[in-house]
From Swiss-Prot:
SUPFAM superfamilies: SIS domain. Its main location: cytoplasm. This is Glucose-6-phosphate isomerase. One of its GO terms (molecular function) is carbohydrate derivative binding. It is found in: Cytoplasm. It comes from Helicobacter pylori (strain Shi470).
Length: 545
């Protein structure tokens, strides 16, 4: 456990020594701070100079990583050891994008050979849709693709397709359906022509309640309009491992793309779950996405900790969570194409590390994953940045932006990028009472009024942030960015001694929903309901009589 590691008390002592130091002072005393605390990898750079740390902090954090045998645990993941201990599974999302030729054997399975076989089928299918060779039941080309999934079968593909929209096939429109409330699927369907629509049903078991409910609604809509169930074969494909259920639905087994237990949902966009990405963007761009992630994998696996982006970001996060007692972490992308990135990272981070039981089954006596949240940075400035600047919570921030200007939008990117830099500077530097008072007096305010108002215009600063810069929003850079966060999450899971690759927390609610659903549908359940739940069931039933 973290608190039992030999470096932990050293970090506690060091924290007490520097907790009151203001970053302003570090910057004023160290003119090289910005250049020393800056890393570049391929087209991605990290400025971590605006963090509440110094060389001693970093030295101790790297010692902490060594205490945890982080290097050995990184190797164990890449080699296919069953590090998902509660489910006795390997964790090989990295193999999905591997460009190495050294085969990985897992329970007599040739992992890379299996992955590349599915990728080959995905490429052929994608080409047939994009080229117009694959036609609908009236011989129309496909114009719309509907991805039906939830969680990891939705968020990654949605994020990537949105981020890389500029690379999409001009004929194709992407739609994503995950919510089971009925509104989303019906809103999507009313825009579509069944004769030119392709549905991708993404569910490993092909029994996920939300996904199957939406898929059956889409199937009913399609059959009613096409007039014959046999047309399903041309318009529905599945990403699943349950061949029997897929065939019962009416999908041809040749239109089923498999993935494996060694790929967790939140790590699956690189697998057949990314079929929608490949069709929308094309195999060339999908390959570039994989390559960007692979290059980050190699960096994570081989770079010294001192220059290793995922290791550094993971350790800095631990520094705030376990020593500064930070409970929250903000993702603030300053690019419209990255608007779904915070939501994707929410699942990646919180479903992986939102746990309090160690690998040995013991209750952990320290904090693990913070609440991860975020929004488009420029919009967030006018919504909740007030709390970040002057509130009572210490919330580290990841600013994410690109250097590349958008065509036909003169002046826009300069305004956007200036705000990234200004906000990061403001969070670091702040504004003292004396500075606020001087500004108000300079503007001509009465001295007594200025003294009172100045208190409200103080910014304490010392708010930490990272600035992640991509040269441009491209397939390879998005691949690298996602892999960076995947590995950051892994690093923190190792430090906290938790299994980052299971998600038992999603199960209990699903189990309890079964008897409640029976009651709502008018069937008697033998389950026990607390008085609150029972009353709400009756309220629903009475309203819908």
């Amino acid at each position: 456990m973290l608190t039992q590691l030999k470096t932990y008390p050293k970090l506690l002592k060091h924290y007490e020594e520097i907790k009151e130091v203001h970053m302003r002072d570090w910057f004023s005393k160290d003119k090289e701070r910005a250049s020393r605390y800056f890393l570049q990898f391929e087209s991605l750079s990290l400025d971590y100079s605006k963090n509440r740390l110094n060389d001693t902090t970093l030295k101790l954090l790297f010692e902490l990583a060594n205490d945890c045998s982080l290097k050995e645990k990184i190797e164990a993941m890449f080699k296919g050891e069953k590090i998902n201990t509660t489910e006795k599974r390997a964790v090989l999302h990295t193999a999905l994008r591997s460009l190495n030729d050294t085969e990985i054997l897992l329970d007599n399975m040739e992992v890379l050979k299996s992955i590349r076989s599915v990728l080959k089928r995905m490429r052929a299918f994608s080409d047939s849709v994009r080229s117009g060779k694959r036609l609908g039941y009236t011989n129309q080309v496909i114009t719309d693709i509907v991805n039906i999934g939830i969680g990891g079968s939705d968020l990654g593909a949605l994020m990537v397709c949105t981020a890389l929209k500029r690379y999409a096939h001009p004929r194709l429109k992407m739609h994503f359906v995950s919510n089971v409330d009925g509104t989303q699927i019906l809103d999507v369907l009313e825009k579509l022509n069944p004769a030119s629509t392709l549905f991708i049903v993404a569910s490993k078991t092909f029994s996920t309640q939300e996904t199957l409910t939406n898929a059956l609604t889409a199937r009913k809509w399609f059959v009613e309009r096409s007039g014959d169930e046999k047309h399903i074969a041309k318009h529905f494909v599945a990403v699943s491992t349950n061949k029997e259920a897929v065939q019962q639905f009416g999908i041809d087994e040749h239109n089923m793309f498999e993935f494996w237990d060694f790929v967790g949902g939140r790590y699956s966009l690189w697998s057949a779950i990314g079929l929608s990405i490949m069709i929308y963007l094309g195999k060339k761009n999908f390959n570039a996405l994989l390559k960007g992630a692979y290059l980050m994998d190699e960096h994570f696996r081989n770079a010294p900790f001192e220059s290793n982006l995922p290791v550094l970001m993971g350790l800095i996060g631990v520094w705030y969570i376990n020593f500064f007692q930070s409970k929250s972490h903000l993702i603030a992308p300053y690019d419209q194409y990255l608007r779904h990135f915070p939501k994707f990272i929410q699942q990646l981070d919180m479903e992986s590390n939102g746990k309090r039981i160690s690998k040995k089954g013991e209750i952990i006596p320290y904090d693990t994953c913070p609440v991860v949240w975020g929004d488009m940075g420029i919009n967030a400035q006018h919504a909740f940045f007030q709390l970040l600047h002057q509130g009572t919570h210490l919330i580290p921030i990841d600013f994410i932006a690109s250097l590349d200007k958008k065509p036909n939008a003169k002046g826009h990117h300069e305004i956007l990028f200036s705000n990234v830099l200004a906000q990061a500077q403001a969070f670091m530097k702040g504004k003292s009472y004396e500075e606020a008072l001087g500004e108000l007096l300079f503007k001509g305010l009465d001295k007594d009024e200025a003294k009172d108002l100045a208190h409200h215009r103080v910014f304490f600063g010392n708010r930490p942030s990272n600035i992640l810069l991509l040269e441009k929003i491209s397939p390879s850079n998005i691949g690298a960015l996602v892999a960076l966060y995947e590995h950051k999450v892994f690093v923190q899971g190792v430090i906290w001694d938790i299994n980052s690759f299971d998600q038992w927390g999603v199960e209990l609610g699903k189990e309890l929903a079964v008897p409640i659903l029976q009651e709502l549908e008018g069937h008697k359940s033998n389950a026990y309901f607390d008085s609150s739940t029972k009353r709400l069931i009756e309220l629903y039933k009475n309203y819908n009589q």
